[in-house]
Design a protein with these regions (language model features):
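Anion-binding and metal-coordination hotspots
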Residues: 3, 8-9, 15, 72, ...
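Basic, short loop/linker segments at the boundary and entry of helix-turn-helix/winged-helix-like folds
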Residues: 28-73, 78
């Protein structure tokens, strides 16, 4: 190699010193300063953080929950979620040494804090959403809703369905029959042959052990099947009790379905929830209502994809002042491709309370109502047999053995008609939907690498998700507002809340004093109604 000069590092034998003050470990523009001010200005006791108490006052004092909250916010911002990894960083990461002032809790303490404070973590996340409103970072007019599957701390094999348990039980029964045949064969051989020599691989003793193991397995499977039937659920998870097998586009995930509502102004998450449903059809109203409450608005527009289309959900949204835009999947394309006439070709005439068919004949309501499999009450509209017999479109509309055409109308079909009318001009809104709501999931999954949960059970998983959502919003707000402005906001907000608290306490004291004076006046008046009691308040 040609001799040339290269950059060289510092000799490991050369003495070096860190800055003399821990304060100098981070510069003035480091985001850990925003984390510090944010947590210090929170009323952690109000949020319900759990502080472990030493038995009888003995032992070391506990770590302040604010310090552990700072640690987790920093960790989730920088893709460090494991309690062991965070414990390692506390000994080598200068930013964390500054943030926790040199404290080094063990990994068990770190893990226990996240596990026990799931409700408080949700409260902190909601508090930050309130701060986003105060910073005027949310529009409060349009939100987009979407869901994504996240892996749970459970394998696909640990989650059993009723069908899978039945198949495993049937396999055990078949194995019983096979081993029973082997045992019968061995018994016959022992009756006719000399027992001298070593036992073979299919000896009675070995087979009996296998049969005993099969019996134990069969009892366990029967117990699991009984538990599943008693629970009323469709799946039984043996590791994480709330994780479920979720399927989308041929991909099966053992985990949870995370739902988010994202404001369109700056793509900030304003409401979220973790469920274990395998689809989104029952989530629209719950998420839209949660977003409406968090934003504290009287009206809201919500955008969602086809997976959220559900008549009952659309009606619930309309009842709560929420205007929903959800495209409906085209389910009649195959029928129309065959030249058949679908129910969509029938137009409802509100004045006549009848449907008009493509041949301009009326379908009128018949007596009685029907409750379909989804629990919806529907009204039956039927054509006249004479009209259908003489119709030139009969072959495309009816089968040879069907005398008349029937159309069912939901009792709240007007809700869907208004929705369909809105969707005719909603192309632009639907294009915006993807840009709004898919940004958070893309950021969390691809940039941060958060595709799975570390904890188990709804409560703990929801607490962990709250950390993810909080840190996503925190980083976006920091990039939008800037470090100095955000720190100043945290400080001013805390001062205003403190002043408000003092005023509230003073008002309560004055009210108590006035009440006491009124009671004294009443007592004095009852003793001497003729002589009014006079108070000298001047001196």
């Amino acid at each position: 190699m040609t001799i040339r000069s290269f950059k060289t590092g510092v000799s490991r034998e050369q003495p070096s010193f860190l800055p003399a003050r821990v304060e100098d470990y981070v510069d003035a523009n480091n985001l850990v300063r925003a984390i510090e001010v944010f947590v210090d200005k929170l009323d952690l006791e109000e949020f319900g953080f759990v502080v472990p108490a030493a038995a009888g006052g003995a032992g070391q004092p506990p770590y302040h929950p604010g310090d552990l909250l700072k640690l987790y916010i920093y960790g989730y911002l920088f893709r460090i979620r494991s309690s062991r990894a965070l414990a390692r960083e506390l000994g080598r990461n200068l930013e964390l040494i500054w943030l926790l002032r040199g404290l080094r809790p063990c990994f068990r303490t770190i893990a226990t804090f996240r596990k026990d404070n799931w409700a408080a973590l949700k409260a902190v996340n909601r508090e930050f959403v309130l701060m986003m409103r105060e910073l005027d970072l949310v529009g409060g007019e349009v939100v987009a809703v979407d869901g994504a599957f996240f892996h749970g701390d459970a394998s696909r094999g640990s989650i059993k369905t009723q069908r899978r348990l039945a198949e495993e039980l049937a396999k055990v029964d078949r194995d019983f029959e096979d081993y029973g045949a082997v045992l019968a064969k061995n018994d016959a051989a022992e009756a006719t042959q000399d027992r001298a020599g070593e036992a073979g691989p299919n000896s009675g003793g070995e087979i009996e052990k296998k049969v005993a193991a099969l019996m134990a397995k069969r009892e366990a499977l029967r117990a699991d099947l009984a538990r599943l039937e008693a629970s009323g659920q469709t799946q039984l998870s043996q590791t994480d009790p709330d994780a479920r097998l979720l399927s989308k586009n041929g991909r099966v995930v053992a985990g949870y379905n995370v739902q988010i509502a994202v404001d369109d102004k700056h793509k900030l998450i304003v409401a979220s929830e973790v469920v274990n449903d395998g689809n989104d059809t029952g989530q629209l109203h719950a998420m839209a209502k949660a977003a409406k409450e968090e934003l504290d608005v009287t009206a809201l527009t919500v955008l969602a994809d086809t997976g959220y289309y559900n008549g009952g959900e659309l009606k619930a949204c309309e009842d709560d002042g929420i205007v929903a835009y959800v495209p409906q999947a085209k389910r009649t394309a195959r029928l129309e491709a065959q030249g058949r006439i679908s129910h969509e070709a029938f137009v409802y005439d509100a004045e006549k309370d009848a449907y008009r068919c493509p041949a301009d004949k009326l379908l009128t309501p018949s007596e009685g109502r029907k409750t379909n499999t989804g629990g919806r009450i529907e009204i039956r509209y039927t054509s006249r047999k004479a009209d259908c017999d003489a119709c030139v479109l009969r072959a495309r509309c009816l089968s040879a053995k069907t005398p008349t055409r029937t159309v069912y109308r939901w009792e709240h079909e007007a809700v869907l008609e208004r929705h369909r009318a809105r969707m005719k001009t909603a192309a632009g809104r639907m294009r915006r939907r993807g840009a709004i709501v898919e940004h958070p999931f893309g950021t969390l999954k691809c940039r941060a690498g958060y595709r799975h949960f570390l904890l188990r059970g709804f409560d703990k998983v929801r607490g962990e998700w709250s950390l993810m959502a909080l840190c996503y919003n925190f980083s976006r707000v920091l990039s939008i507002v800037g470090l100095d402005k955000l720190i100043a906001f945290f400080a001013k907000r805390a001062a205003d809340l403190s002043l408000l608290g003092h005023r509230t306490a003073l008002t309560a004291a004055i009210v108590s004093l006035v009440t006491l004076l009124a009671q004294l006046c009443d007592a004095a008046g009852s003793k001497s109604a003729a002589t009014p009691l006079r108070w000298n308040l001047a001196g």
